[in-house]
């Protein structure tokens, strides 16, 4: 019977441990925190966005950080395979807007508890509060793992330690150190799915304001580099929310270039053409012709956003509407569809939902998740140089790579 050690009890580690146990291996899951699945518990605002109902081509598209590496893993273990497995374990799921899949109970705790039950079923030994300090390699093959408490012999080790985001959940980049010690390359570690810091200070005046159904674009060198439609929010330092988090991957890449000049452009009324928006504004101005400008826009915008839009259009909010010129009205229209902020930086990696960068994929076989340098060493999940957008794509990547790594660790090329 093979002895397999899984390092890290996040989504990838839980899946790897369960599958290795199911396939007949003796499995030890080593977790440095006092519980497994800690970070999984905060995904989807504590509801656990397990996966997405999109097809696999869409998954690759929504994984800007080396998505093509996942083709093999998704062929072996797709979102449908994952849901079939979870349903067989008794978890009921539902699909929400954007194809996001959640447990029916809206409880991440239920997902974790089901994994704990299945780990027990397959006699997986779970060791909590036991960080791994090194991996032992002899003749280019894994032979053991050392923790701060014990030395373990093994036939295979699967690194599932996550990235460097949300360190309070245990993701502190330990896996990078372990992999580097045995000769692997670590690519540039940086935040992904992270809020954006802007140079403009007026954002503080509207911090907490959420906008829905807006179009947000990243612009550099006068070109739109990426755009997203949906929700966003102003904060004391800049911008956050689903659209912003997704765009942060592009912003991060641009920031690494020499002398980057990046702006974020918000279209507050993307459903309207410039002409239709102007007519809409004229209609409101006719209705409120005797009022001041600030009062004439209350049907169009959230109240606390109105002074900002007027200021950006370089107009006086107390000016009577019946004195507003056509040129001034068109300036307002322009700001409504081209509200521009300049990017200063991204928030730190500790605040990111996922980490971009990781163990270099050039050194791993995408069909097996086994190291090309060291036999019996595997990587799965966010510790690898993979990152995706929000919507269940990151968890699916973790589950799929964990599954593939476990299957090959147990069966080798015979599976």
What is the predicted function of each stretch?
Residues 1-12:
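Beta1/beta-strand and adjacent pyrophosphate-binding region of the FAD-binding site
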């Amino acid at each position: 019977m093979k002895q397999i050690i899984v390092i890290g009890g996040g989504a990838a580690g839980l899946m790897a441990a369960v599958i290795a146990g199911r396939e007949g291996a003796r499995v030890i899951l080593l977790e440095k925190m006092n519980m497994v699945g800690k970070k999984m518990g905060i995904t989807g605002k504590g509801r656990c966005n397990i996966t997405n109902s999109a097809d696999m081509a869409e998954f690759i598209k929504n994984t800007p950080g080396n998505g093509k590496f996942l083709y093999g893993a998704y062929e072996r273990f797709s979102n449908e395979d994952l849901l079939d497995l979870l349903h067989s374990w008794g978890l009921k799921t539902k699909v929400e807007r954007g194809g996001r899949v959640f447990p029916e109970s809206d409880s991440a705790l239920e997902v974790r508890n089901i994994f704990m039950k299945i780990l027990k079923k397959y006699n997986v030994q779970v060791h909590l509060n036991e960080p791994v300090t090194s991996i032992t390699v002899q003749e280019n093959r894994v032979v053991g793992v050392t923790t701060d408490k014990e030395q373990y012999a093994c036939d295979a080790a699967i690194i599932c330690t996550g990235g460097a985001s949300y360190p309070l959940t245990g993701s502190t980049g330990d896996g990078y150190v372990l992999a580097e010690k045995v000769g692997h390359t670590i690519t540039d570690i940086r935040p992904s799915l992270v809020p954006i810091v802007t140079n403009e200070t007026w954002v503080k005046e509207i911090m907490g304001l959420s906008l829905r159904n807006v179009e947000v674009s990243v612009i550099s060198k006068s070109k739109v580099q990426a755009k997203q439609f949906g929700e966003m929010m102003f904060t004391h330092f800049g911008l956050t929310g689903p659209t912003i988090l997704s765009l942060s991957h592009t912003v991060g890449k641009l920031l690494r270039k020499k002398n980057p000049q990046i702006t974020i452009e918000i279209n507050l009324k993307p459903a309207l053409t410039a002409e239709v928006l102007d007519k809409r504004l004229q209609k409101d101005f006719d209705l409120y012709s005797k009022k001041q400008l600030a009062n004439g826009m209350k049907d169009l915008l959230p109240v606390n956003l109105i002074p900002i839009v007027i200021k950006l259009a370089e107009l006086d909010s107390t000016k009577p509407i019946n004195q507003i010129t056509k040129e001034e009205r068109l300036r307002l229209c322009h700001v409504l569809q081209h509200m521009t902020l300049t990017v200063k930086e991204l928030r730190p990696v500790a605040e990111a939902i996922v980490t971009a960068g990781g163990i270099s994929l050039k050194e791993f076989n995408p069909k097996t998740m086994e190291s090309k340098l060291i036999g019996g060493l595997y990587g799965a999940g966010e510790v690898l140089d993979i990152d995706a957008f929000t919507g269940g794509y990151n968890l699916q990547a973790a589950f799929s790579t964990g599954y593939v790594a476990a299957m090959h660790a147990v069966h080798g090329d015979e599976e």
